Amino acid sequence: MGALSHLRVLDLSRVLAGPWSGQILADLGADVIKVERPGSGDDTRAWGPPFLKDAQGENTSEAAYYLSANRNKRSVTIDFTQPEGQRLVRELAAKSDVVIENFKVGGLAAYGLDYPSLKAVNPKLVYCSITGFGQTGPYAKRAGYDFMIQGLGGLMSLTGRPDGEEGAGPVKVGVALTDILTGLYSTVAILAALAHRDQAGVGQHIDMALLDVQVACLANQAMNYLTTGNPPRRLGNAHPNIVPYQDFPTADGDFILTVGNDGQFRKFAEVAGQPQWADDPRFATNKLRVANRAELIPLIRQATVFKTTAEWVSQLEAAGVPCGPINDLAQMFQDPQVLARGLAVSMPHALAGAVPQVASPIRLSETPVEYRRAPPLLGEHTEAVLGDVLGLGADAVERLRSSGVL
């Protein structure tokens, strides 16, 4: 039994941030019911190619994007623009612990599915609203996608090559990181609200905004600005506060060197055949190395090209200096540590026979994550959920289906 197997979550969200939170809760054992539009479902079902292939090598209807954020859930199709559909969602909410939604501010009020409406039928409900900009403020009514929030929220000003270098300019992160982090923060907030409910007996509304999360996750870079008034500049792969902490060329590619303290720098200098660097008045401490970055980095680049990536990694690891290769995803999934940790799993799938999944990183000793159910087909569990949760019989379900509610 999962740690959250006593909970039911009604997931009205689409795309990534909300579904990511729902998947985490589902991985931990919660019964997560994904409510989708009849006929089309979650937008990401069509966000391909690539699509999952069947045994004959033909594309199925399941896009890889959708498959990344929806395992261990049950899918029901309900058209809640119709009164009958609204009634069904309200009845499901009355029997749920959590609702997750990511509609525009006020969007669900028109259907009687906003927090005040559902609180009236279930005062213990934890209701998590995820939007681009939050429920308040001048941007509250605006839609917000990860890419635009990375730009507006300052992250892209920190990523990319520095001005003056070839290819200079702001660059977005290679995955929808703001969405994913919002999903993580939403999960933390939901669990906190559930803990409060267990003590106080009442639920609450959670107002999560992609912009808020993005700003919060600027972390040390935000503090670099707030303590100085100077906006941090793009440094490519370099670190604003630690040197050397970036990529360097090797005889056959590149590697990452992450020197975290002066002792590690001394060890690196010895492996590099330049022990004098550790006592050089320009480089002896991290503060000096940051101040003299422009002098030190070219010297390191001149030294690193004489060994292969594997040689650097082997020798520096032996010396206790953190470093590593730069892997593509094929190399990453074949890395012995990734294999040992079981970070790729396979689950039975109705259309393809099996579907690959990235494993949850959560490792609990007493209530481990269980891979119970592949990302569901559209409406795969409609009849079962309406029967199990609401007690509707086959005739009632068929009537709702024939009237276009399901």
Please name every model-derived segment.
Residues 183-203, 216-227, 269-276:
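Oxidoreductase and adenylate-handling cofactor-binding alpha/beta cores
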Residues 284, 348, 352-399:
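Flexible, small-/acidic-enriched active-site or ligand-binding loops
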Residues 318-372:
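A glycine-rich dinucleotide-binding beta-alpha-beta segment and adjacent secondary-structure elements
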Residues 135, 165-176, 198-214, 233-240, ...:
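Conserved Rossmann-fold dehydrogenase catalytic segment
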Residues 241-319, 323:
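Aromatic-enriched alpha-helical interface/lid elements that frame and gate functional surfaces
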Residues 39, 133-134, 210-215, 252, ...:
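Glycine-rich beta-alpha junction loops
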Residues 1-189, 193-199, 377, 383-406:
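N-terminal helix-loop segment corresponding to the beta1-alpha1 unit
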Residues 32-35, 317-331, 392-397:
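Short, well-structured beta-strand/strand-turn elements
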